[in-house]
């Protein structure tokens, strides 16, 4: 019989301690079946080349599994012998002092090189007694041999020697939080990589006083367009708008309309405002004419012939201002 010290020395945690940093015990399902469970079953009571600890699941609660079985910090690997409820039956007794393991879902096949080598059963631990047990976050994958890799019956002297390999882990919210954080980081990264989506335009909805800066120049505001595919006409509009944003036309006579005053002063100011705005629009049309001359016939055709009003409307200037 092996002493406790010998078991510790042969445990996976001790083997990992001798490996370079970064190496972890992370076997695939077929490796667990063929390279570990198969050897355990064939060696029977003899010590396999690499030993996982042995746990009696009927006498051990999931949270009491020895820490030496913990591999990688999140999974517990160990051998166990299935305790059959009846000597002549195949049903397994999975009850503990405080609860029981309940199978969930269908068993999954484990293949190696296209051949069936084992099965994996998923079980969840319930506290209390069936059928009123309370479901917990403890999950177990039970691996058993199947197919041609199953040892012959004469190698099993009793039902208790029906070996299985178990992987136990505790489901918690850490994985969800990590995924959320990753998504958040991804969203932030994606947003940071996008170019600035600011298109200048003249905003006629805001207060008139905000059109003028301290040096009485017209101010072009910025607008964030929708995320949509730009057609050829929309691209042209953007070019026209950029040209408008480069205009900085002085306003010679600031009007009472912008600073407040009486009704008569406001009407007088409105006439002066329209006159001043016409200066802006003339300069604007001059710029548009230059751009229209540089466009091909197909590009300029979409605006119509002599449709100055449609040009002004497309870049955000209402026709009511032009008709002052």
Curated annotation (Swiss-Prot):
<keyword id="KW-0805">Transcription regulation</keyword>
<feature type="short sequence motif" description="Bipartite nuclear localization signal">
    <location>
        <begin position="120"/>
        <end position="137"/>
    </location>
</feature>
<dbReference type="GO" id="GO:0003700">
    <property type="term" value="F:DNA-binding transcription factor activity"/>
</dbReference>
<dbReference type="Pfam" id="PF02365">
    <property type="entry name" value="NAM"/>
</dbReference>
<comment type="subunit">
    <text>Dimer. Interacts with SINAT5.</text>
</comment>
<protein>
    <recommendedName>
        <fullName>NAC domain-containing protein 21/22</fullName>
    </recommendedName>
</protein>
<dbReference type="GO" id="GO:0009734">
    <property type="term" value="P:auxin-activated signaling pathway"/>
</dbReference>
<keyword id="KW-0010">Activator</keyword>
<feature type="domain" description="NAC">
    <location>
        <begin position="19"/>
        <end position="171"/>
    </location>
</feature>
<keyword id="KW-0238">DNA-binding</keyword>
<dbReference type="GO" id="GO:0005634">
    <property type="term" value="C:nucleus"/>
</dbReference>
<dbReference type="GO" id="GO:0003677">
    <property type="term" value="F:DNA binding"/>
</dbReference>
<keyword id="KW-0804">Transcription</keyword>
<dbReference type="GO" id="GO:0048527">
    <property type="term" value="P:lateral root development"/>
</dbReference>
<dbReference type="InterPro" id="IPR003441">
    <property type="entry name" value="NAC-dom"/>
</dbReference>
<dbReference type="InterPro" id="IPR036093">
    <property type="entry name" value="NAC_dom_sf"/>
</dbReference>
<keyword id="KW-0832">Ubl conjugation</keyword>
<comment type="function">
    <text>Transcriptional activator that mediates auxin signaling to promote lateral root development. Activates the expression of two downstream auxin-responsive genes, DBP and AIR3.</text>
</comment>
<keyword id="KW-0539">Nucleus</keyword>
């Amino acid at each position: 019989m092996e002493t406790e010290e010998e078991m510790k020395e042969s445990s996976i945690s001790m083997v990992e301690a001798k490996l370079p940093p970064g190496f972890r015990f992370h076997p695939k399902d077929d490796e667990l079946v063929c390279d570990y469970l198969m050897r355990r079953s064939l060696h029977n009571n003899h010590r396999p080349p690499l030993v996982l600890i042995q746990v009696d699941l009927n006498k051990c609660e999931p949270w009491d599994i020895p820490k030496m079985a913990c591999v990688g910090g999140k999974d517990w690997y160990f051998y166990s012998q299935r305790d059959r409820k009846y000597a002549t039956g195949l049903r397994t007794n999975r009850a503990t002092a405080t609860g029981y393991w309940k199978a969930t879902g269908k068993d999954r096949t484990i293949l190696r090189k296209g051949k069936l080598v084992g099965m994996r059963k998923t079980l969840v631990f319930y506290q209390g007694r069936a059928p009123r047990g309370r479901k917990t976050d403890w999950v177990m994958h039970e691996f058993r041999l199947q197919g041609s890799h199953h040892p012959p019956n004469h190698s099993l002297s009793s039902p208790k020697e029906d070996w299985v390999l178990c992987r136990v882990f505790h489901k918690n919210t850490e994985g969800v939080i990590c995924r959320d954080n990753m998504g958040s980081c991804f969203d932030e990264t994606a947003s940071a990589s996008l170019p600035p989506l600011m298109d200048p335009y003249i905003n006629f909805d805001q207060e008139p006083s905000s059109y003028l800066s301290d040096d009485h120049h017209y101010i072009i505001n910025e607008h964030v367009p929708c995320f949509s595919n730009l057609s050829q006409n929309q691209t042209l509009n953007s070019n026209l708008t950029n040209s408008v944003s480069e205009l900085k036309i002085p306003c010679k006579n600031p009007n009472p309309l912008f600073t407040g005053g009486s009704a008569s002063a406001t009407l007088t100011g409105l006439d002066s405002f329209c006159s001043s705005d016409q200066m802006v629009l003339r300069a604007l049309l001059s710029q548009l004419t230059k751009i229209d001359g540089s466009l091909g016939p197909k590009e300029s055709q979409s605006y119509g012939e002599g449709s100055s009003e449609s040009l002004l409307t497309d870049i955000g200037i209402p026709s009511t201002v032009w008709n002052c």
